[in-house]
From Swiss-Prot:
This is Zinc finger protein 620. GO terms for molecular function: DNA-binding transcription factor activity, RNA polymerase II-specific; RNA polymerase II transcription regulatory region sequence-specific DNA binding; zinc ion binding. Pfam families: KRAB, zf-C2H2, zf-H2C2_2. It comes from Homo sapiens. One of its GO terms (cellular component) is nucleus. Keywords: DNA-binding, Metal-binding, Nucleus, Repeat, Transcription, Transcription regulation, Zinc, Zinc-finger. Its main location: nucleus. Gene3D superfamilies: 6.10.140.140, Classic Zinc Finger (3.30.160.60). A zinc finger (C2H2-type) spans 196-218, 224-246, 252-274, 280-302, 308-330, 336-358, 364-386, 392-414. GO terms for biological process: regulation of transcription by RNA polymerase II. It is found in: Nucleus. The keyword Metal-binding applies. CDD domains: KRAB_A-box (cd07765).
Length: 422
């Protein structure tokens, strides 16, 4: 019988995280990696929902962005802390047998174990990759080639797992379902389990829920909606992080200027204003950017790709956020309200710029003369005074301008009709 002793101190993500080295990650197949990714993001969402202030773990950022989740050696001190408590008695048994933690895990199981839950109200469960699960009478039975483990799931948490029966039927938590009539597109993988194959990339999934979540990566579907502003997100963890914006909480402080930000990602991007760091460089034109999202939007200028089209005016956009803000011009929606004066605005960016009127903040400073501005575009236009750049050229007379506004006013001189002389 597996029992969990709940701790009284606040739960952190490290309490429910498992780390892999590069070699260990390479030994996992696609199904195991997908399961690991879903479990870690779910655990992070559960921890984040407890409202304890903490920085988004590097592991979570890697998983959300589709990066390889390794780089920290789990057998270093931090990794050992994250793995400690995977199974009560494992650490003591390891010392008794004279094995290193790494040797112990490799000998104990044929593959890696994940910790699911670990929070009050859920029982920590150890899932052996490649195992099949059954749930008779409130108990989980984990089948492996070497042993069976039993423990009680007091939270009645359900996980789907499928096992072939007589070549035609499989069990879904004890329910027999015909493969031929209900799951005609499914495949049987080498381990003998029913799996779902992605038609886009060929990946297999044992759980239908995991398969449907994976499909959203190809379709771009975002099923988690913010009730405050209507914005959609692909993962619940991203929604939770976004909702902090509406609460007004800004727990992350910039040490340079003291500005508070709602997320650690926003803090990192903000700090690049002070450092001037621009790690994302365009290979087409050499232009560098401090934000990866802005960099991706810029690349679409070279490719001409515009994925979003407005049904009202048929204008197209290369960026989903610009498309969303544009649609509010037609609907009149202004979901962002200034707490100082009550003015409502159509985008979070417009709200941030507006709030600088009240705070007097001018975060964009010219390195040539030290003059500061409250908008980045104003700084860019100002810098042309020093560089002499005039990117706006009149096709009628060839005159050039450094400011877009002056260029537009000049064009009107050519479009105005000349009065007819008597």
């Amino acid at each position: 019988m597996f029992q969990t002793a709940w701790r009284q101190e606040p739960v952190t993500f490290e309490d429910v995280a498992v780390y892999f080295t590069q070699n260990e990650w390479a030994s996992l197949d696609s199904v195991q990696r997908a399961l690991y990714r879903e479990v870690m993001l779910e655990n992070y969402a559960n921890v984040a929902s407890l409202a304890f202030p903490f920085t988004t773990p590097v592991l979570v950022s890697q998983l959300e962005q589709g990066e390889l989740p390794w780089g920290l050696d789990p057998w270093e001190p931090m990794g050992r802390e994250a793995l400690r408590g995977i199974c009560p008695g494992d650490e003591a048994r390891t010392e008794k047998e004279g094995l290193t933690p790494k040797d112990h895990v490799s000998k104990e199981t044929e593959s890696f174990r994940l910790m699911v839950g670990g929070l009050p109200g859920n029982v920590s469960q150890h899932l052996d990759f490649g195992s099949s699960l059954e749930q008779p009478q409130g108990h989980w039975i984990i089948k492996t080639k070497s042993k069976r483990r039993h423990f009680t799931d007091t939270s009645a948490r359900h996980h789907e797992a499928y096992e072939v029966k007589n070549g035609e039927k499989f069990e879904k938590l004890g329910k027999n379902i015909s493969v031929s009539t209900q799951l005609t597109t499914n495949q049987t993988n080498p381990s003998g389990q029913i799996s779902y194959e992605c038609g886009q990339c060929g990946r297999y999934f044992i759980q239908m829920a995991d398969f449907h979540r994976h499909e959203k990566c190809h379709t771009g579907e975002k099923s988690f909606e913010c009730k405050e502003c209507g914005k959609y997100f692909r993962y619940n963890s991203l929604l939770i992080r976004h909702q902090i914006i509406h609460t007004g909480k800004k727990p992350f402080k910039c040490k340079e200027c003291g500005k508070g930000l709602s997320s650690d990602t926003a803090l990192i991007q903000h700090q690049r204003i002070h450092t001037g760091e621009k790690p994302y460089e365009c290979k087409e034109c050499g232009k560098a950017f401090s934000s990866s999202s802005v960099f991706l939007q810029h690349q679409r200028f070279h490719t001409g790709e515009k994925l979003y089209e407005c049904n009202e005016c048929w204008k197209t956009f290369s960026c989903s956020s610009s498309f969303t803000v544009h649609q509010r011009m037609h609907t009149g929606e202004k979901p962002y309200e200034c707490k100082e004066c009550g003015k409502r605005l159509s985008s979070n960016t417009a709200l941030t710029q507006h709030q600088r009127i009240h705070t007097g903040e001018k975060p964009f400073e010219c390195k040539e003369c030290g003059k500061a501005f409250n908008q980045k575009i104003t700084l860019i236009q100002h810098q042309r005074v020093h560089t002499g750049e005039k990117p706006y050229e009149c096709k009628v007379c060839g005159k050039t301008f450094s400011w877009c506004g002056r260029f537009i006013l000049h064009q009107k001189l050519h479009t105005q009709k000349t009065p007819v002389q008597a």
